[in-house]
Amino acid sequence: MLQSLRKMTGPLNPCNSGSIIHKSAQNGLASITFGGFGWRTADITINAVTLANARLLKATAGNLYNGAASVSNFWYCYFNSTTTIRVRAYVGNNLAVNFGWGVEEFSQSQSIQRGQSLCFAGGSTGARTQDVTITALPDYTKAGVVIFNEFSASGEASGGTSDCRNITGQLTSNTNLRIAGDVIVADATGFYISWEVYPLNG
């Protein structure tokens, strides 16, 4: 079972997850401070690293526009040939309901191939959860590790309408996980994005 959507108070399993918490740096993870209102984009770049015969991924956070980002390294993780990533985005004051994103969750899991787009629809409130299973394709693997590029989530709708968050992915030699949305944040509002990347085959 993946970790619940909450502010982390204890150590994280470095192979399972990472998070960005607005105006807060916890467990050595990156801290992002937003300025004003409007679109927020956080890019988490994961590069393949080979160290002592171990296949590792090194993650850094940065490239935030319409705001400022504190960039740091946060974890290494083994990748096997089949990997699932779950992305959760939440906006709220102390993880309470605020600005239309609440406590509901919507999820789905399926395989994705190069260039394939996924979409799921939910209500106008709720945390958005998207599971995507990345299956190894020989043409797009490197040293037996499945890595993907330009995996993005965007398209939050508000005002009582449905949400359609598009997930796209490509299998290439490097990974960029981009989470974007038309999230409106006030000074007293927390902004929480977590991602979980872990091997399915040990």
Task: Pin down the residues of each PLM region.
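Fold-core signature of tandem repeat domains
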Residues: I44-I46, I85, W101, V132-I134, ...
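Beta-rich globular "head" domains
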Residues: N16-S72, Q110-R165
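Short, structured beta-strand segments at or near domain termini in extracellular proteins/domains
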Residues: A96-S109, T189-G202
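Short beta-strand-plus-loop segments that form exposed binding edges in beta-rich domains
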Residues: A89-N93, D182-V185
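Enriched but not universal
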Residues: M1-A25, N201-G202
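Extended low-polarity, hydrophobic cluster-rich segments
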Residues: S4, W75-F79, G102
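A cross-kingdom feature marking solvent-exposed beta-strand/loop segments within repeated
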Residues: S70-F79, T168
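Residue-level recognition of beta-strand termini and adjacent short loop/turns
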Residues: A48-N53, F79-T83, P138-D139, L171-T175, ...
